[in-house]
């Protein structure tokens, strides 16, 4: 990242740390929301019921509404106390913990799955709002798009990296004769650890 696009006094390593958050948290949306757990929820947790997809989308809608209703007050609190990093840590721990707890979701655990995914998605979305609030502090006005795009690209790389790890685990588990109720929960632990340490 060229220093010329950064705000005055900002070091490249600060932008690197900011972008690496996208690298880490994209593991959640890629494996839980988009590619693995959503299919597991519909086919295994809900047993392929006709209402399963509606239940999944309702869960995401509830989380989105909760984010919408709380974003302004959370942002105001962060601005008033000047402690965005603490809030970001809280949202990260919340999403990681709820994702890890998906390990315990098996066939028939519809309510548990919906609650955990709603919590994880709420913390993820709230964290996205907070991390975005750092951008004007990192880049000059004319270069916000460049720095944002750089972080976005790292997010894609992180999401695909975690998905690759999970799929490698799933292929190996299938080779051992394991079913989805075994290898998908383990993939959720992989996702949680990836988000926590990446």
Predicted features along the sequence, with ranges:
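A membrane-interface helix-boundary motif in multi-pass transporters
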Residues: 49-57, 167-193
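Cytoplasmic helix-loop-helix junction between adjacent transmembrane helices
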Residues: 116-154
């Amino acid at each position: 990242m060229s220093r010329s696009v950064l705000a005055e006094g900002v070091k490249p390593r600060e932008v690197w740390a900011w972008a690496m958050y996208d690298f880490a948290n994209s593991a959640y949306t890629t494996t839980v929301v988009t590619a693995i757990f959503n299919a597991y929820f519909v086919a295994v947790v809900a047993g392929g019921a006709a209402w399963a997809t509606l239940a999944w989308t309702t869960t995401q809608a509830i989380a989105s509404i909760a984010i919408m209703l709380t974003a302004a007050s959370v942002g105001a609190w962060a601005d008033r106390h000047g402690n965005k990093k603490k809030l970001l840590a809280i949202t990260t721990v919340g999403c990681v913990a709820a994702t890890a707890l998906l390990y315990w979701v098996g066939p028939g655990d519809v309510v548990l799955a919906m609650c955990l995914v709603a919590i994880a998605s709420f913390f993820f979305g709230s964290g996205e709002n907070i991390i975005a609030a750092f951008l004007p502090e990192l880049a000059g006005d004319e270069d916000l798009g460049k720095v944002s795009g750089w972080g976005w690209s790292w997010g894609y790389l992180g999401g695909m990296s975690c998905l690759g790890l999970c799929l490698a685990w799933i292929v190996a588990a299938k080779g051992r004769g394991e079913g989805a109720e075994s290898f998908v929960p383990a993939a959720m632990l992989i996702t949680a650890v990836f988000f926590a340490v990446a």
